[in-house]
């Protein structure tokens, strides 16, 4: 008897990865719509994380990881933005970037700075994959390059 795809157990969703994606979406929503952090976190926890909304079921996510990223980015934005700006090419300003790219870079930079327990390659890979979910080519490369520069600046060559 052969296993068909429906006979095989489903791979467990990476709940931190889902939290990162939700955090990027929430940060984007805050940037574009001017929604406050408390309101957006409550909305995601009540209606989105692991829930069905408008016929779509959102991935189960680590809610505390989600909260940590969103609240941390909002709290530390004045520290994060100059760091991101210094990692961009000379002729690029953070304000010129797409709102989604800004959200991805802010969340990734926050994790590089604050989550020393997570290896840099994991953080960079996760946020590059998020960029690939929204963009084709240049933006994921930009996310990779900028987060890599920030990681080297903040954590040195250890890449851990």
UniProtKB/Swiss-Prot annotation:
Domain of life, per lineage: Bacteria
Keyword Transmembrane set for record: no
Key words, A-Z: RNA-binding, Transcription, Transcription antitermination, Transcription regulation
Molecular function, one GO term: RNA binding
InterPro entries assigned to the protein according to its UniProt record, in alphabetical order: NusB-like_sf, NusB_fam, NusB_RsmB_TIM44
GO cellular component term of the entry, any: cytosol
An example Gene Ontology biological process: transcription antitermination
Keyword Methyltransferase attributed: no
Family: Belongs to the NusB family.
Known function: Involved in transcription antitermination. Required for transcription of ribosomal RNA (rRNA) genes. Binds specifically to the boxA antiterminator sequence of the ribosomal RNA (rrn) operons.
Protein name as it appears in the record: Transcription antitermination protein NusB
């Amino acid at each position: 008897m052969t296993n068909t795809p429906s006979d095989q157990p489903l791979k467990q969703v990476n709940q931190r990865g889902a939290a990162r994606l939700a955090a990027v979406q929430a940060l984007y929503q805050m940037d574009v719509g001017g929604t406050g952090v408390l309101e957006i976190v409550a909305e995601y926890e009540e209606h989105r994380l692991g829930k069905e909304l408008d016929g779509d079921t959102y991935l189960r996510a680590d809610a505390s990881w989600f909260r940590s990223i969103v609240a941390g980015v909002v709290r530390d934005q004045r520290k994060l933005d100059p760091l991101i700006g210094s990692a961009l090419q000379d002729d690029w300003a953070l304000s010129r970037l797409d709102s989604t790219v800004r959200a991805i870079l802010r969340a990734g930079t926050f994790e590089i700075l604050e989550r020393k327990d997570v290896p840099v390659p994991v953080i960079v890979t996760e946020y590059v994959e998020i960029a690939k979910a929204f963009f084709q080519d240049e933006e994921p490369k930009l996310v990779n390059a900028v987060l890599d520069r920030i990681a080297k600046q903040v954590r040195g060559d250890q890449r851990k």
